[in-house]
Amino acid sequence: VKMAVLTSSNDRKMAAVYRARPEVRTMFDRILTAEMFSRSKPAPDCFLLGMEVFDTTPDTTYVFEDSFNGLKAGMASEATVIGLATTNSREAVAPLCHCVLDDFTGFTYDKMLQVHK
């Protein structure tokens, strides 16, 4: 399973993340930053670019998001969107995604595949 971070943060902000958490670079196949796409979330550009990079389609792409703009961007990309109620409440996140998680405890690959649009 290929995984990427698709962030509205720029390279400079991500450099600070890498200094604080160097392991982040090795946890993902790609990290796509704001310099790589023209419009920020809630536009779907970052997710569409991610699909292009991995040569995949919305039907086989899962977006995990906690921000409102990220959730909107994921839905606009037509991927399956899993909302994380880590920053905002379940009630606020639920209308903007296909499934809501409080955290990743007990969430497996098989459970992810059971989430449908």
Listing of model-derived features with the role each one plays in the protein:
Residues 10-117:
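Asp-based, Mg2+/Mn2+-dependent phosphohydrolase catalytic module
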Residues 1-2, 78:
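Glycine-centered short loops/turns at secondary-structure junctions
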Residues 4, 8-9:
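Structural signal for alpha-helical transmembrane segments and their flanking helix-loop junctions
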